[in-house]
Each structure stands twice: as structure tokens, then as C-alpha cells.
């Protein structure tokens, strides 16, 4: 039985959930069953490349014009390169990740007549990114592309429901595959704080993620200001970068030394080890890997209740969720900083939940089953191959969450 050839396309490998998931699949799917190639562009000047930081040995095919920037001429060239590579590689399946790669990659797959097409929504662009008019155009484009896609994968059930509500795809096309993550060994708290130059005494609140508009770094600063005012010995650390990093740096002047900017770090485990809780302030999310990593590190989370965040963070059990309001978020943070017992209980529950549900092995198995279902459907593999296959989300009652047999 010949291995399935899978061409994986992602616009850029900037540090974040999509890059982590792509690397996990490239490394985790069995090589005797899947021949994979990863195609990606380059990160922007304000971004760190996940390949450089966490996966330097991974083979990557670079497509220069496939990055973040949108431009008709560059996108047309990237489309042509992808279609040419597909004709050479002759993949059974093209699997695209993120919006731009999903558009160009699926268009190229149609041109190159690739039979199997899969797209993963690691979130969506329906709100928080564009004007309402542009968001409607994005939804119309995604709806059209969905008609030419075999399987639509979402990282959470809420993301799926939002997309269906916008008229994108049909329920039977969808499969929910939550992210999978693993942390390396965590240093001790004192050693981690010493490495980061943080005070040994006092609580530490950490933000791990991009500094872009949808993540609302302005709200992050407002929360930090309120928390530091209420808990004067608290330190807020920001691990990340982005196009709004300069604005955050300017705001730091009024909060220094209680607000620390770390930039991107390859040793994110050090940040989690130094922290007492993790903060997320976004207007829109898929299923943030930083919250899964926080749970794996035994840390509670205070987050906005957006996207599929509530599928990671159980309000009152593994963290605290709040509306998109800086004052309410700050109150949740202060509550946890002042109640050591509650904070430790939530962190222990978060660790148990994330270790059970969000491991990389489960992610790989979910996607492997999805590919196997396509292989049988298209006649590439015999149907007996699926004997014993399980649903990607076994506890879900939604029919779209089961791999079509």
C-alpha cells in the first residue's frame, strides 16, 4: 500500500498555535504511511520564526511571497509556485493552515487537480480583524472555497459553530480537532525568575502571545495598570512581539519596573515556571495554545470568554473567564493573586484537564484518522484500514465532529 503524499501549506511559521500544530503533525505522523512536505513563507520583521526557535532541523520548502503581506502580484506568484509544486509532488492531500494559505493553497489544489483538500481553521477572521463589510467578503470567499474542500477542521466546537453560522461549509464537512501541546522540563520558580531578571518575591502575571490588534495589548496594559495598583508587589511580564510592540513599550515607561517586556523566547517553559497565572485579553481567538501550555505548567488562567477559550478554561474550575472588559479582567487577576488556595486549586485542575485532553499524540491520531478516512473514500486505501478507527472528538454529540467513514 503506497504512502499518502500530503502537502502541508501555512503562510508563515510565526510563533503561535498554527506553527506548533504544523510541526507536531510533520514530526508525528508515521513516515511509512505518510510522505509529507511543508511549504511556508517567511515571517515579518516583527515576528519570530517557530522553525528557528523550536524546530531548526525540520525540512521546509520556502515560498518567498507566501508570507503575511497581501498583494495581488505577490499572491499570484505564490499561487503559481504552489500549483507547480503540486504538479511535481502529486500529493493525494493538500492540507492548508491559516487564512491566506487556505485561499492560495486550495486555489492551487483546484488548478493542479489535487483530489484531497483539507483546511484547518485555527480561528477565524469573522470579527476582530476587519470592518464589517470586509468581514462579509471574507465569509463569502471562505464559503466559496468550502464548496471545493473535502474536510474543514476547526480547533474547537465554538469556532465551527461560528463558521457554520456565517454560511461557511456544511455540518458534515467539519471535524473538530483541538490543538495538542507538550512542554519541556520546567525549571524551578526561583531559577526561572533569576533567569528572567524578575523579583523573587511577589506574584508574577504572564502574557504569552502576539502583540497585534485582535489580541488587544491596549487592554493588557489597562489590566496591568489596575493589577499593579491593587497589588503593588505584582509584576506583569509580556512574552511576545508584534506590530503593536512599540505601543506596549511606550506604555511600559509609566509602569516600569512592574511591567517587563521579554520579546519572544525559545525557552517559554522559563516564563511559565516564573509565573503565578496567565492572562489573555483577546477580542477573538481559536483555541489558544498558550492557555493549554499554561495548564500543562499547572497555572490557572484569566481570559476573555471568546472563541473556543471556554473549551480549554473551565470557568471557576481551571481559571476565570470574563467579558472583554479590562476592569473585570483585572478584578479576576487580583482575586487569584490574593487567594493562594484558590489559585493553586485551579492550577492543579488545569494541569489534570490539559494533560488528559490536549496532548500531541491525540492531535496526531485525530489527523491520521481523518486522512485515513479520505484515503478510503477516494479508493487509495482499502476500507479494512479503518477498522478500529475512533472519532477525533469521542465525547462530542455533534455529527460534524466524527470522521466520515
How would you label these PLM feature ranges?
Residues 4, 8-16, 20-74:
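N-terminal strand-loop element at the rim of the active site
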Residues 7, 199-215, 221-225:
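Conserved donor-binding/catalytic core segment of Leloir-type glycosyltransferases
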Residues 47-52, 186-199, 204, 351:
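A short helix/loop element that forms part of the nucleotide-sugar donor recognition site in Leloir-type
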Residues 264, 283:
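Aromatic "clamp/platform" in nucleotide-sugar-dependent glycosyltransferases that forms part
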Amino acid at each position: 500500500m503506497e504512502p499518502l503524499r500530503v502537502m502541508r501549506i501555512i503562510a508563515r511559521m510565526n510563533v503561535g498555535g498554527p506553527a506548533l500544530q504544523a510541526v507536531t503533525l510533520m514530526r508525528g505522523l508515521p513516515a511509512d504511511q505518510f510522505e509529507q512536505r511543508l511549504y511556508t513563507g517567511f515571517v515579518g520583521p516583527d515576528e519570530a520564526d517557530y522553525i528557528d526557535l523550536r524546530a531548526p532541523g525540520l525540512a521546509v520548502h520556502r515560498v518567498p511571497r507566501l508570507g503575511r503581506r497581501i498583494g495581488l502580484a505577490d499572491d499570484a506568484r505564490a499561487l503559481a509556485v504552489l500549483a507547480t509544486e503540486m504538479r511535481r509532488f502529486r500529493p493525494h492531500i493538500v492540507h492548508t493552515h491559516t487564512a491566506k494559505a487556505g485561499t492560495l493553497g486550495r486555489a492551487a489544489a483546484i488548478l493542479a487537480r489535487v483530489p484531497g483538500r483539507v483546511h484547518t481553521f485555527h480561528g477565524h477572521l469573522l470579527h476582530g480583524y476587519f470592518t464589517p463589510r470586509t468581514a462579509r467578503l471574507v465569509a463569502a470567499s471562505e464559503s466559496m472555497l468550502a464548496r471545493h474542500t473535502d474536510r474543514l477542521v476547526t480547533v474547537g466546537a465554538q469556532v465551527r459553530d461560528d463558521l457554520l453560522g456565517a454560511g461557511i461549509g456544511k455540518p458534515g464537512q467539519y471535524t473538530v480537532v483541538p490543538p495538542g501541546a507538550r512542554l519541556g522540563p520546567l525549571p524551578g520558580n526561583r531559577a526561572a525568575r533569576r533567569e528572567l531578571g524578575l523579583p523573587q518575591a511577589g506574584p508574577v502575571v504572564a502574557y504569552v502571545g502576539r502583540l497585534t490588534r485582535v489580541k488587544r495589548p491596549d487592554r493588557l496594559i489597562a489590566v496591568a495598570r489596575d493589577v499593579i495598583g491593587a497589588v503593588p508587589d505584582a509584576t506583569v511580564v509580556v512574552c511576545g512581539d508584534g506590530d503593536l510592540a512599540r505601543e506596549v513599550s511606550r506604555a511600559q515607561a509609566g509602569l516600569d519596573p512592574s511591567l517587563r517586556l521579554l520579546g519572544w523566547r525559545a525557552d517559554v517553559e522559563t516564563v511559565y515556571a516564573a509565573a503565578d497565572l496567565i492572562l489573555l485579553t483577546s477580542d477573538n481567538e481559536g483555541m489558544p495554545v498558550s492557555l493549554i501550555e499554561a495548564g500543562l505548567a499547572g497555572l490557572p488562567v484569566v481570559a476573555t470568554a471568546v472563541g473556543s477559550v471556554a473549551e480549554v478554561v473551565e470557568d471557576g474550575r481551571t481559571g476565570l473567564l470574563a467579558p472583554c472588559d479590562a476592569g473585570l479582567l483585572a478584578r479576576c487577576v487580583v482575586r487569584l493573586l490574593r487567594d493562594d488556595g484558590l489559585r493553586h486549586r485551579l492550577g492543579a485542575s488545569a494541569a489534570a484537564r490539559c494533560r488528559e485532553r490536549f496532548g500531541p499524540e491525540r492531535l496526531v491520531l485525530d489527523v491520521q484518522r481523518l486522512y485515513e478516512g479520505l484515503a478510503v473514500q477516494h479508493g487509495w486505501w482499502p476500507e479494512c484500514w479503518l477498522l478500529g478507527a475512533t472519532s477525533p472528538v469521542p465525547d462530542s454529540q455533534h455529527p460534524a465532529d466524527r470522521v466520515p467513514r
